[in-house]
């Protein structure tokens, strides 16, 4: 939702394209569940705003996928619901959360919690964490090549 949705789109682009300009590699499959405005608005209208991420997740999620949930409050109901769906499919979940981690904390396999009340600081840390983790992923890929 909001800035976290923008962060999700930003980070998924890093997986599909690349993080560092000096590295050429195959694209890594990634999608932001917040990127398709037609699906989001249709789902919000026809079902409920709390289900906007569930419908695409249910259609796209496969065994061995990883779901990264990004929310500054940790309490976004639409994120909580998709995390519950991921758990029922035995999909690994990583939470980029803020504050105390909120309701999402108990549905994530790995919690990266920024203990702040400042939305801006939380979002800045989420992007840093996303870049740092992905840099490690790229390094692992390069070692295997």
Residue spans for each PLM region:
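Active-site donor-nucleotide binding/catalytic segment of nucleotide-sugar enzymes
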Residues: 1
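Glycine-rich phosphate-binding loops that contact phosphosugars or nucleotide phosphates
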Residues: 4-143
């Amino acid at each position: 939702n909001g800035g976290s949705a923008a962060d999700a789109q930003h980070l998924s682009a890093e997986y599909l394209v690349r993080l560092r300009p000096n590295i050429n590699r195959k694209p890594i499959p990634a999608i932001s569940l917040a990127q398709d405005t037609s699906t989001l608005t249709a789902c919000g209208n026809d079902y409920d705003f709390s289900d906007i991420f569930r419908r695409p997740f249910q259609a796209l999620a496969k065994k061995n996928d990883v779901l990264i949930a990004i929310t500054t409050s940790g309490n976004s109901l639409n994120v909580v619901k998709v995390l519950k769906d991921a758990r029922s499919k035995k999909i690994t979940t990583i939470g980029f959360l803020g504050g105390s981690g909120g309701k999402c904390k108990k549905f994530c396999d790995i919690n990266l919690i920024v203990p702040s009340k400042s939305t801006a600081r939380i979002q800045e840390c989420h992007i840093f964490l996303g870049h740092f983790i992905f840099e490690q992923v790229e390094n692992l890929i390069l070692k295997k090549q």
